Amino acid sequence: MPVSGLWFEQLEVGLRVQHATTRTVTETDNVLFTTMTMNPQPLHLDAEFAARSQYGQVLVNSMFTVALVVGLAVPELTLGTTVANLGFSRVDFPAPVFIGDTIHVVTDVIEARRSRSRPGTGIVTFEHRGINQRDETVCLAVRAAMMQCRPDPGRPDPGRPDPGRPDPGRPGPGSPEPERS
């Protein structure tokens, strides 16, 4: 798996990332997530019920929203460099998400320290903000993650090919030709 995330040393307090990927939420997203998580809330599933609510339409499941917000942050921030998600200290939904809303994410690094118990790792606290096309914040999530430190120069990076080591799936020089049938 390629590593495009940032190493612990690159995740300095004050770093702000405006993530490139956006996502328009579909009815299918909402129905699948809501039913897979066994949440029968009619605000998420019943258009007639939701039409009579203060919102006048179906609300997207808020747990889908937080999952989407964190997921949209992965490619530029943590892909291949996260050891573990440690938890959320805050999750707020200041505005609802509706079918057809397009979400983009801005992430700030608000804390970073080396792990005291796991050498080669650090603990980073991220503040992710999901923002819709009307520039309304729809989700604010503060989470801590254990992140890999940059590997030693003498060791290959995890997830990146080591040019000095043959790929076990490909024959190298002097290897017998594979049998052909």
In which residue ranges do the predicted regions lie?
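Conserved interaction-surface patches within small, structured recognition/assembly domains
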Residues: 89-91
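HotDog/MaoC-like acyl-thioester-processing domains
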Residues: 2-13, 93-102, 106-181
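Hot-dog-fold acyl-thioester-processing enzymes
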Residues: 1-87, 139, 152-159, 177-181
